[in-house]
A protein has these predicted regions:
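Conserved active-site and cofactor/substrate-binding residues in soluble primary-metabolism enzymes
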Residues: 9, 36-39, 86, 104, ...
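Noncatalytic linker/hinge segments flanking ATPase motor cores
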Residues: 53-58, 107-111, 162, 195-202
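Charged/polar, low-hydrophobicity segments characteristic of intrinsically disordered regions
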Residues: 43-47, 118-129, 188-195
């Protein structure tokens, strides 16, 4: 269960452009170029292109054209404020518009960042684990719009805007491999509490 914060206060903005003249995929984050050839971004781009080919989209750009991506956010990056979730949700939404993909973008956003599948929607959202081995049904769904609780406010105090020394992805992998408590939480605590929260949000 999660709550998507208002994009008026904290947001990511992303523009994408594809061209047959581009030699490689490139990305600029807050004005600084970063690698687009490895890691989650490369995997995300590949997944979106494969989805576009499978859907037979009628976009005016070819899936083998390279893309240039410009993204910026107005809050600290990699500092524990879900910048990856916001960034990948925004990026995949833009890519789906570029390639004419009309299907749910939640599963594609998850390829970049797990939490991004939730950030695609506003309001109150639940991320469903799914059963497929390829994770294709591990998607999010909106339970209630933001208007369900108009008086809700979130106070965020940034103690440090420096990048974390350990990324969220690596930290979670380490926790999965070393923590018995995390396994208990995933098997027992999360399902029970999610069902309680679900009954409250949809009532």
């Amino acid at each position: 269960m999660s709550v998507t914060l208002s994009s008026e206060e904290m947001h990511a903005k992303t523009s994408v452009m594809a061209s047959k003249d581009f030699l490689t995929d490139r990305i600029w984050l807050n004005g600084v170029e970063e690698s687009a050839s490895t890691g989650r971004l490369a995997s995300c781009l590949q997944s979106v292109r494969e989805a576009a080919r499978a859907a037979g989209s009628e976009a005016r750009v070819e899936t083998d054209w390279r893309v240039h991506i410009c993204s910026e956010n107005n809050f600290p990056t990699a500092a524990g404020l879900a910048s990856s979730a916001a960034g990948y949700a925004c990026l995949v939404s833009a890519l789906c518009k570029l390639y004419g993909i009309k299907s749910d973008v939640s599963a594609l956003a998850r390829r970049g960042s797990g939490s991004a599948c939730r950030s695609v929607y506003g309001g109150f959202v639940r991320w469903f684990m799914g059963n497929r081995e390829d994770g294709g049904d591990s998607v999010a769904a909106q339970l209630q719009p933001a208007s369900h609780w108009p008086g809700l406010r979130v106070i965020i105090c940034v103690a440090s805007d420096h990048r974390k020394t350990t990324s969220s992805s690596l930290g979670m992998r380490n926790s999965v491999n070393t923590s018995e408590l995390l396994k208990y939480r995933a098997e027992y605590s999360v399902p029970a509490r999610s069902n309680i929260s679900l009954s409250l949000y949809v009532s």
